Amino acid sequence: MNTPEHSQLGKASAYADQYDASLLFPIPRADKRAEIGIDGNAPFFGADLWTAFELSWLNLRGKPQVAIAHITVPCETPHIVESKSFKLYLNSFNNTRFASEAEVRARIRADVSEAVWRGAEHPGTVGVTLLLPEAFDREPIHELDGLLLDRLDVECTRYQPAPELLAAHHDEAPVTETLVSHLLKSNCLVTGQPDWGSVQITYSGAQIDQAGLLQYLVSFRNHNEFHEQCVERIFMDIWTRCRPIKLAVYARYTRRGGLDINPLRTSHPQQLQRNVRTARQ
């Protein structure tokens, strides 16, 4: 079984410049999900929205081509792809000739689909779109909508996940609201390098205590976990401790190595967020 410790994270790596799908390193979701009480089917829907800003290949005449790639990985996949391996994989396109942008897109879709669905009884596919330079100026920047939790003047003393900080007012009328914080920080599971993000929490149900929620989000500050795992932990902690009727947790992390990863988890099926970067990304 692939584990994060066996990946290229934190290790010196040779950069292949000829296409090599074997560089992709899938990691099972199940182990980390078991830590947060998920055994079998996950109690949420959603996807991991990836943006790759450093993608280049050669056309058949050897001229370099560039694009921005948007990749959508359903959260039902049994694996994630370790991000450094994905960077190395994309770099392997650099000196490889392809007939068209469509061929590159199809190759990425097939390779990533095989990696994340590996071993699944009913494998599916991932979504891949490539944005070419003539469309770059149509890539918007937009901050997450919602009431900013960071306005609250709270004392923060916990820097490992502390779900006991979460509470909801079940003796009051239910509400529907969207809350946002830009203070999310965690660390890479393997290297300990900081990961910075913004998080949006939309829910219906008993009103969540906002001060406690902000303190809870800050408590991830020294926690070592991948982006996808942090968002699933946040979702499960709010779901079990605050017991909302509906819940969506969406985080956008700043890029590293030309990649950003933006997980979305929802209690009910809904249309995926458009993959729009924030100013910090």
Swiss-Prot record:
The active site is at C188 (thioimide intermediate), D195 (proton donor). Keywords: Cytoplasm, NADP, Oxidoreductase, Queuosine biosynthesis. InterPro entries: GTP-CH-I_C/QueF (IPR043133), NADPH_dep_7-cyano-7-deazaG_red (IPR050084), QueF (IPR029500), QueF_N (IPR029139), QueF_type2 (IPR016428). GO terms for cellular component: cytoplasm. Pathway: tRNA modification; tRNA-queuosine biosynthesis. Homodimer. It is found in: Cytoplasm. One of its GO terms (biological process) is tRNA modification. Catalyzes the NADPH-dependent reduction of 7-cyano-7-deazaguanine (preQ0) to 7-aminomethyl-7-deazaguanine (preQ1). It comes from the Bacteria. The keyword Cytoplasm applies. Its main location: cytoplasm. The keyword Cytoplasm applies. Its EC number is 1.7.1.13. Transmembrane segments: none annotated. Substrate binds at V81, E82, S83, H227, E228. This is NADPH-dependent 7-cyano-7-deazaguanine reductase. Belongs to the GTP cyclohydrolase I family. QueF type 2 subfamily. NADPH binds at S83, K84, R256, G257. GO terms for molecular function: preQ1 synthase activity. It catalyses: 7-aminomethyl-7-carbaguanine + 2 NADP(+) = 7-cyano-7-deazaguanine + 2 NADPH + 3 H(+).
